[in-house]
Amino acid sequence: MGNIGFLLPLKVFVVVLCNFVTTLSEESPSTTTDQLALLALKAHVTHDPQNLLATNWTSATSVCNWIGVTCGSHHQRVTALNLSHMGLIGTIPPPLGNLSFLSELDIRFNHFHGLLSMELANLSSLKYINFGHNNFRGEIPSWFDSFTQLHSLLLYSNNFSGVIPSSLGSLSNLEKLILYDNDLKGQIPIAIGNLSKLKRLYLDNNQLSGQIPSAVFKCKALEFLSLTNNVLEGSVPQEIGNLTRLRYLYLDNNNLTGQLPSALFKCQELEELDLSQNALEGSVPQEIGNLTKVIWLHLYRNNLTGEIPATIGSLSVLRYLYSENNSLTGQLPLTLFKCQELEDLWLFDNALEGSVPQEIGNLTKLRWLGLNRNNLTGKIPATIGSLPVLDFLYLDCNSLTGRLPTLQPSLRGFSVSNNNLIGEIPSSVCNMSSLRYSLDLSRNNFHGIIPECLGNLSNSIAMVDLSMNSFHGKIPENFHKDCLLRLFGINDNKIEGSLPRSLVNCSKLEILDIGNNNLIDTFPIWLEKLDLQVLILRRNRFYDRIDNFEGKFSFTHLRIIDLSHNDFNGYLPTKFFENLQAIRSESENKDDPKYMKYSGTNRGYYIYESLFITIKGSEMELLKILNAWTIIDLSNNRFKGQIPEVVGELHSLIVLNLSHNSLSGPIPSILGNLSALESLDLSSNKLKGKIPAQLVNLKFLEVLNLSWNNLMGLIPRGKQFDTFTNDSYIGNLGLCGLPLSKECSNEQNLEPKPTKSGEDGDAVNWKYSILMGYGCGLVCGLSMGYIVFTTGKPWWLVRIIERVQQKYVIRGKIRRSGGRK
């Protein structure tokens, strides 16, 4: 025994040595393969902002110690590669396909680009792929079916195009398929229905078309399904009832039609349901009460009709209900106010009627309440003033009566415009220090004085609209030194006194409308440095000259100015027109104009929905004012002298009204350069000379009024001038030629020489042109007849408004609170 005792340590040494040699012989070549594959990837990275790969991925250290690399504990082969959120720019090289033990590949939130190399198909051990938020392009490779062990495929937010390959349907272990935010087209492949383990399917924000295949609803394990923002059509299949585990369903912003399928309400695990922005019709079924776990219910912008079912009261955990922009009728069901978890309730733009129940006071967690643009009647319940966390209350455009209740100080936005409310502004308004967005009491029957405290609130609130009531007294004098007002409207009241000079503190003020009151003051030159875009002083008692401009940058942002029906006098100030840079320059956003709005919240809303303008003697209201509108109305004052030549440099001007003044001299021929002009009214002045032939070049001109001046000579013909009637020229005894019955003498018959741009029509006989003009006028008249009859607006105004608003079609989607789970 003593002779062989020394053999035990020797045996241990031999075993360890053999294992080391075996490991070394097995590991080195394979480890080298992995290292070369990763070094090839490093070489294809053109930008490494944090130098993570540059300083860490070196041959001096084991690949298993490299950042983002995980190796197996036994064989020391690379099993996972995570380079997410590194800001890398580059491409994926073919050698990466040599990582034969790789099971997880995560390179999300980088800037990798190009096509996916086919050699990646060799990564047959992959279970998890995340290429999200990169710039890969091309079709999703059909060879993805090589990854038979794959349970998660995330290719979201890239530039993949083409169709979704049917081969993905063979990935029997797939649980997550996330392809949103790409450029995928075509139909959803039926083979998706083979994915029996699929739990999450996100195909939103692509261009997928056709109907939703019933096969999708064979994936009975689905918990998340999002097909948002595609061009899917047809009805929602009844097979959706198979998805009894479904928790989140987003089908919004498609072209889906038909009724809400009754089978949908078998999905009793639903927590979020979004069917908004489709063309769904019919009523909301009583079975909606089965969705007792739903938190987020979006049905807005469809064609839903009928009453809100009483069973909605069963949705005890409902927090967000958006069903606006439908045609829902009937009264607000009392059971709705059992949903005491409600935070957002939006039912505006429907046809709801009846009163707002006192039970609304039960919704103590309510933050947003939008019942505007319905047919609600009765008084505003006092309980609405006791909602402790209410931020936004919109009840405008109904038929509500009575007085305003005491309001919560927590309110940040409040509108009751377009109702039949009476009384004075309650003192509780002075305590609303949280107001940030809007205080809109316009178009009611309120009276009394405007509280001084509104001036103090101006350091927080963006919009105050008290227009079209019966307020009297003076405008508050105490606008805060840090005034944040963007809109201040008190037009159409009985306000007296002068404009408070503290308004100059409102450096962000864009819209000031004080028209149709009894204000007495001079022109507010002291507002010249503000960002005013709309200035309306019409129908007051403003007086004196407006030519005392000294600054170079006075009113440079003004696009709409209405000084009509005042007592201004003196000469039209050249300097004033020179400063109107917003009208002098061509519109930079002709193809993408915006409505004038203040988007201070995630819901967005218009801050100024109307103004009154005078065209051809008729006072009309324009709704939802476009940024493209440019209007100058100085009519019904006592201006004298000639029209400044600089007016012809206002290239974006659409409406110009200088009528009913004492202007003299000729009509400047440079007005023919106003290429956007659609309405020109110079009537009831003392203008003389001939009508410039250059005005024929105004191809959009719909309204021309030169009546009651001292003009003479032949009336120009051609283009829009062939459509104007006698009314445009009446009261000018020296004018002759069509459309007037007075013929011209030989001397008068010398037609003004046309400009170069008008010569293209000279080959046509002028009498024939006149006949064509009248013919076109007849056709247009017939086509517009229905609009005129139903709206009560003259055809010429309808055409001006429609042209401006149809030029600019705005289509956008407001994304609601909540997010992808």
PLM-predicted stretches and their roles:
Residues 1-821:
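Plant-biased, solvent-exposed loop and capping regions
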